[in-house]
Amino acid sequence: VVRRLSGLTTETSAVFNMTTQFGGGKTHALTLLYHLAKNGSAANSYRGVGKILERAGLAGVPDNCAVAVFVGTEFDSLTGRGGNDGTPSRKTPWGELAWQLGGAESFAHVARHDAEFIEPKGDVIDKMLPADRPCLILMDEVLNYVSTYRDHGWHNKLYNFIQALSETVRGRHNAVLVGSIPA
């Protein structure tokens, strides 16, 4: 992940699917990635990071990484996030991820998609992602979100979005998508 965020595409992947049983460490791994990306070069001195960097063949963790986190057990599409705090109301995973990645500028690209609950596709997702810095998207407990909204037909929209997001991220040299689902 750190190699890809650093812009290296050889022997790297842009998309990771972590699948283990409950209690298998998925959320802990996502938390590690979050702190590495959020703290950039400050994380170089954290215990164990030197080994990660050595194995990756890197001098340090890249700085200025845009990070977004979607947790399916926490996000509620009926109430959404924002709206009462001076930020736009966000009722979809793509609206929330866009907001976290680039604030109003990124959200503007998917605002209509969010309002109409229509998943964005490649060109729109590409505009939503920051172009000038590394980008890490973490998605945890996705199946919980899917099962909650299955009766509304929203689960297919999330699957379609994740597929389009995966393809868009693969086309970037410094973007990574990491998702977790229980085995």
Question: Which residues does each PLM region occupy?
Answer:
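A short beta-strand-to-loop transition that corresponds to the Sensor-1 phosphate-sensing loop
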Residues: 33-34, 71-73, 140-141, 172-175, ...
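Phosphate-binding P-loop
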Residues: 4-15, 21
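Substrate-engagement module of ASCE P-loop NTPases
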Residues: 97-100, 124-131, 156-177
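Conserved ATPase-coupling elements of RecA-like P-loop NTPase cores
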Residues: 145-158
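Phosphate-handling catalytic cores of nucleic-acid transaction enzymes
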Residues: 41-53, 156, 172-174, 179-183
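Mid-core helix/loop region of P-loop NTP-binding domains shared across ATPases and GTPases
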Residues: 107-139, 149, 168, 172
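P-loop NTPase motor core
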Residues: 16-21, 28-123
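Short glycine-/polar-rich loops that comprise or flank the Walker A/P-loop
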Residues: 62-67, 133-134, 172-175
